[in-house]
UniProtKB/Swiss-Prot annotation:
Name of the molecule in the record: Uridylate kinase
Family matches, as InterPro entries: AceGlu_kinase-like_sf, Asp/Glu/Uridylate_kinase, Uridylate_kinase, Uridylate_kinase_arch/spir
pH note: Optimum pH is 7.0.
Membrane-spanning intervals of the chain: none
Activity regulation remarks: Unlike most bacteria, is not activated by GTP. UTP acts as a competitive inhibitor against both substrates. High concentration of UMP abolishes the inhibition of UTP at low ATP concentrations, indicating that UTP binds to the acceptor site (UMP site).
Gene: pyrH
Amino acid sequence: MMNIILKISGKFFDEDNVDNLIVLRQSIKELADNGFRVGIVTGGGSTARRYIKLAREIGIGEAYLDLLGIWASRLNAYLVMFSLQDLAYMHVPQSLEEFIQDWSHGKVVVTGGFQPGQSTAAVAALVAEASSSKTLVVATNVDGVYEKDPRIYADVKLIPHLTTQDLRKILEGSQSVQAGTYELLDPLAIKIVERSKIRVIVMNYRKLNRIIDILKGEEVSSIIEPV
């Protein structure tokens, strides 16, 4: 059995689309039927951004803003966990230690954020490392990695293959790791996938029904190789 971690962008939940959850459940079942063991990490999305914005406007400190974002991501994790029903272990871990313990039960484990100052991308990299997963799939609202945001710049082309060093260059000077902007791995997540030689696949969550083909390299996505 092959272990993989699926990081689901918070934008997946912003769409309020029940079909997203139905397709996600079907995709997880298909992965299990094809010999994959899956862990899932959820982002906080607009729920996190809304609470963070309100709290910041009344002067709440950054550590507490991080906690609001973490709890929003965990709310999304509960939604996914409940939608998976018997496929999932019925507990959302709040730390890496809890994730490892839950993972030992043999079912899908769904988690959100862990601690302030740490993105859910970094959490996904950490749990990939802890579960001995050699592939981390990042499902977001674009088809892969671009040099610039494809939703703003119509002429940019998808980069099908790149290294973590290439990704660092793309991220240099950008604001793409801030809430509400084009999402890629943050520097901490990159360091983790490099040290454990974890391959990263960036895909569009609207193509989750093709995830087996994406893992085989037969569908549009970006593959990031650790170096």
